[in-house]
Amino acid sequence: MAADKRDYYEVLGVHKNASDTEIKKAFRKLAIQYHPDKNPDDKEAEEKFKEITEAYEVLSDPQKRAQYDQFGHAGVGAGGFSGGGFGGFGAGTPFGDIFGDIFGDIFGGRPRGSRGRRGDDLQYNMELSFEEAAFGAEKEIQVPYGKRCGDCGGSGAKPGTEPKVCPTCRGAGQVRFQQGFFSVSKTCNHCNGEGRVVENPCTSCRGSGMIRDTKTLSVKVPAGVETGTRLKLSGEGGQGIKGGGNGDLYVAIAVREHPIFTREDNDVLCEIPVSFVQAALGCEIEVPTLDGKVSMKIPEGTQSGRIFRLRGKGVPQLQGYGRGDQLVIIKVETPSNLNKRQRELLEEFARISGEDVHPMKKSFFDKVMDFIS
């Protein structure tokens, strides 16, 4: 009964003086929220959707709205939908355009027709030396990419011809069919959503509109990159077609291993061997760094594994300021192939130190290792 129906303005959440744009906006928001395809097996949502759709059918039609404003529900009939109810969502009804938008939002796509298509994003794998990664470099690379066919201008059609409007979707890129109460759209299989079909393909690109080519680019690698860093070169990917923008090129960095240095964040690590005599008595040694050799003092009694820090000798901060440090790890070398005199001196040292070097209890080399570690 008409008396049981809610006020149509209340259903859509608008005031009685709302403009057509406000009514359409309110309906679109509610239709997306309560659409049965978005709320499967939800009877309450389905009833809500029917209610807001009924309200919109009346309020979006100037003549019906005027009758409703004057006579209420009785002025538009108690039956709700006119002309057969839910079936009429195609062209020529107030639902034609708006339902196309709604289905596009719900199903994640809209008819593409002849709109431009963006070019592909590309990736180039670049290998750098440790030093290039640390201090930056400028590298020239050869990049294969897709570009518009010069013969057909990217249309895919043989020169002198044009793509034809798809006879299946009539250029919309999508076809619409009835599913129960609702009109559902899907991508046209005949034209793959393009809205046009090529009857006479270009022989150069075989109808794709694109050809393969190679371009030379100069890439400025900033200081401080590491394995896994990706540099983005905007617009240097594949070319777009039909006015679409170019894709981007991503340069993926891989850094080769260094024979001396390793890296932790922005710090550089290296191991420096010293003899057990140098470690015991102290000395001054030369240490390799990314900037060249520097002198470093080893204090007497230095143990194997001790770490010395050379500040500011690490890797520069990527897109920032300052540098990390270099960590020098001391490795005390155990002597081997001792001659008789060297052995005697070490044994004498052990006796003076009160150490037992009897071979049955502990080997000589074990004692030396205990001494220097």
From Swiss-Prot:
Tagged with keyword Aminoacyl-tRNA synthetase: no
Gene Ontology MF annotations: ATP binding; heat shock protein binding; unfolded protein binding; zinc ion binding
SMART domains: DnaJ (SM00271)
Binding site for Zn(2+) 2: C166, C169, C188, C191
Leader sequence segment: none
Cofactor(s) the protein needs: Zn(2+)
Binding residue positions for Zn(2+) 1: C149, C152, C202, C205
Zinc finger (CR-type): 136-214
Main location: cytoplasm
Membrane spanning residue stretches: none
GO terms (BP aspect): chaperone cofactor-dependent protein refolding; DNA replication; protein refolding; response to heat
One Gene Ontology cellular component: cytoplasm
Keyword Ion transport found: no
Cofactor comment text: Binds 2 Zn(2+) ions per monomer.
Keywords: Chaperone, Cytoplasm, DNA replication, Metal-binding, Repeat, Stress response, Zinc, Zinc-finger
Location in or out of the cell: Cytoplasm
Quaternary context: Homodimer.
Family matches, as PANTHER family: CHAPERONE PROTEIN DNAJ, DNAJ HOMOLOG 1, MITOCHONDRIAL-RELATED
Function: Participates actively in the response to hyperosmotic and heat shock by preventing the aggregation of stress-denatured proteins and by disaggregating proteins, also in an autonomous, DnaK-independent fashion. Unfolded proteins bind initially to DnaJ; upon interaction with the DnaJ-bound protein, DnaK hydrolyzes its bound ATP, resulting in the formation of a stable complex. GrpE releases ADP from DnaK; ATP binding to DnaK triggers the release of the substrate protein, thus completing the reaction cycle.
Full protein name: Chaperone protein DnaJ
